Amino acid sequence: MKLLLDIREESPDDIPAIREVNNRAFGRTQEASLVDALRSNGAVLLSLVAALDGQVVGHILYSPASIGDVGGSALGPMAVLPAHQRRGIGSKLVEAGNRYMKDAGWPFIIVLGHPHFYPSFGFKPASALGITCDWDVPDDVFMLLVVDEQKMQSVSGLAKYRDEFSSVT
């Protein structure tokens, strides 16, 4: 019997499960608290869940970000329950979320994440494009996906996340 995976926007009923997914995937509560804070402050561009036969097993969130005066989006957190990792669920969440961000017209997506995971979706080290991070993080974990080449042609400088992210770093 094949299990049915559904990628969809979060609903209010999903909030406890989203907290649980983030807490278990990261082994701490900061990411779940970040998601709650972004949601409470109206700073969620997109929040998707991956539901396996109705059970939420994964979550991804996009929030506003900026580089200079250019507005874009920040991916994160993205989490999958440990028992369901390495099955392509995270990849499906990233693909669906990035497609939505592109269709919505956001010119870039930044991410702080695993340097062996995100490049397969087109993310590159942001420093190669003259873009730096708000925080002191290793160069290879701060990445950028250019969605609109024309809007990003002469953009460089400091990428800014929402203030809510300061509680996580």
Q: What are the functions of these language-model segments?
A:
Residues 49, 55-65, 71-79:
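Conserved beta-strand in the GNAT
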Residues 103-107, 112-138:
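Conserved active-site alpha-helix within GNAT-family acetyltransferase domains
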Residues 1-34, 42-57, 142, 148-169:
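Short amphipathic alpha-helix that is part of the acyltransferase structural core
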Residues 35-39, 129-132:
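Short, solvent-exposed loop/turn elements at beta->coil junctions and helix N-caps
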Residues 86-87, 91, 137-148:
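Accessory recognition modules or surfaces
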Residues 80, 86-99, 111:
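Conserved acetyl-CoA-binding loop-helix of GNAT-fold acetyltransferases
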